[in-house]
Amino acid sequence: VKSIQRNALSAAVALAALGAAPVHAADFTIGLSNGWIGSEWRSQMIDEATAAAEAWKEQGVDVEVVVQSNNVDVPGQIAHVRNFINEGVDAIIINPNSPTAFDPVFAQAKDAGILVIATDAEVSSPDAIYVGIDQKGWAEASARWLAETLGGEGKVVAINGVAGHPANQMRVAGYQEVFGEYPGIEIVNEVNANWDQAQGQQAMQNLLATYPDLDGVWVQDGMAVGAWKSIMDESKTGDIAATGEIRKDFIDLWVENELNSGASVNPPGVMASALNVAVPLLQGRELLEPAEAGQYGNALYLDIPFIDGDNVESVAGDMDGEPGYHSYSSSMTIDQAGALFQPE
């Protein structure tokens, strides 16, 4: 990405032209947009980003966040962005409901002098950068674990998230590509369960009834708990290998039952990482390496941790005392994010 340096005067003029009242009480005001609240992961994402702003205050940089988080369609989330523009925020960090629909409104934000960062799902806009994991790589890692665990052959089903969501689309592409490298792996069915545990459990129950000789299951996020419960109900834990997830209730289930599972980690801390990249950009600092990765050439990818039988007990220990819905998480600290930039 080209050097992002703010021009306070031009931003103020642009905001005045929009009839907005710029927000300047804090050093930086950052709008956080989340367009889907169907999982605790999203709530934790917002909480961790808010905590990241507080950490900046402890270092003498007053970062305030304005949160818009509710169930909205794409036009509703575009309205989030327009609201932030009118409020005169310095940056917008968004978990977008579409990869392409935000291009015009992101251009408006740029014209208003506002930095835009997408997280968790990539966007096509040349006026935004993406800070988060490679969702395709996330799926590839767990699919490769499953394929290798099965010895490169077997009947596999996939239980996916929300059809059409950009992160889900990239994940589907990821596992399909990896399984395509193994001629002995047969994907016998692919279904959607909308990242919902109950729907995942029902989907798995139906799939087991249809395919009693199933060998493997590739399943995403919170749906994994439901899928594994159906596998356990059918007493097939010794016959089936399946991907897992990162919530404490599943990690505990995994350890207690010695499940044959592996899980790529998409930490809810991705929005906190994006915020810790946003602040140096707002301060006028330049990235050591431009954000040019990904299908749109605007991504800065974070590392993807992986949990399997070798480290799951350690992860369980790290999560001791957390509620069952809490997700195993990580994020770049202020110092780690700062290391991505040219020295001051």
Residue ranges of predicted features:
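Short beta-strand elements in bilobed, periplasmic/extracellular small-molecule ligand-binding domains
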Residues: 55-70, 156-158, 176-197
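Hinge/cleft segment of the Venus flytrap/periplasmic-binding protein
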Residues: 178-182, 277-344
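Extracytoplasmic "Venus flytrap"
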Residues: 29-52, 56, 66-79, 89, ...
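Hydrophobic alpha-helical segments within soluble ligand-binding/sensing domains
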Residues: 77, 131-156, 170, 199-201, ...
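Hydrophobic alpha-helical
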Residues: 82, 90-109, 175, 193-253
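Flexible loop/hinge segments that line or gate small-molecule binding clefts
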Residues: 99-137, 141, 148, 155, ...
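Sec/Tat signal peptide C-region and signal peptidase I cleavage site
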Residues: 20-25
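Short, solvent-exposed amphipathic alpha-helices that sit
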Residues: 41-57, 138-142, 166-185, 203, ...
